[in-house]
Amino acid sequence: FMQCETEDDAAKAAEILSDYARHAISSGEPRVMPQVSTACPTIMRLIRMRFPKLIPNIAATVTPVELAAILARREAEAETGLPPEAIGVFAIVPCSSKVTAARVSEGLSRPVLDGAFAIRDIYLRLLNPMRELEEITPMASAGILGLGWASCGGESAARLGERCVAVDGIQNVIRMLEEIEDGRLPEADFLELSACTQGCVGGCFNVENPYAAKLRIKGLLKGLPVSRNRFLFHGEARDIVR
């Protein structure tokens, strides 16, 4: 067993995808509006089952977790010399929907993750060792925009657009999709839809309640740069995102 640590976390990938989205919008893409975020697997299934007319509105891009997994595997390949099939990539996720998505990826030919662990399970194992730490080393590989994706409104804010709508809670999302299907919100360019209250911080596998978690995230963002990552058209993410 060989452990290979990487910095390709979901927040870093979120910043790359946000930067790509800004480039796409400035170049006149996409054509179908409003675009719907792919970040929540529950919402993707909801659209396919109940709102099939809105499938063309789903943004044609991978999710931050998927992009992070692909980049992490490539980094591990380069570091170890092992073939990709000999490398395991696992995610720590906030909800059961993302556990399922780890094994059945939307829009990809095959899953890019080998499995997923619930945040609460990892947290409980780390609780005692964390208490023994005398000094905490900052390890964030993303800035405000990437870390902000964890709560509702963060993805919209990272796009730096004024015509974005963020909705959380499954019933609220259903009502919004009904309005979009009926053409009642033509001014919107982008929909950030989260099944969980307050976004991913409200996932059932989290330890903290979503409102307290959102407050803690605001504290973590203090002093961070706006973003630490950019989408490079000739960079590491080009062949994955496009």
For each of these PLM feature ranges, what is it?
Residues 1-242:
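Iron-sulfur-associated redox domains of electron-transfer enzymes in respiratory
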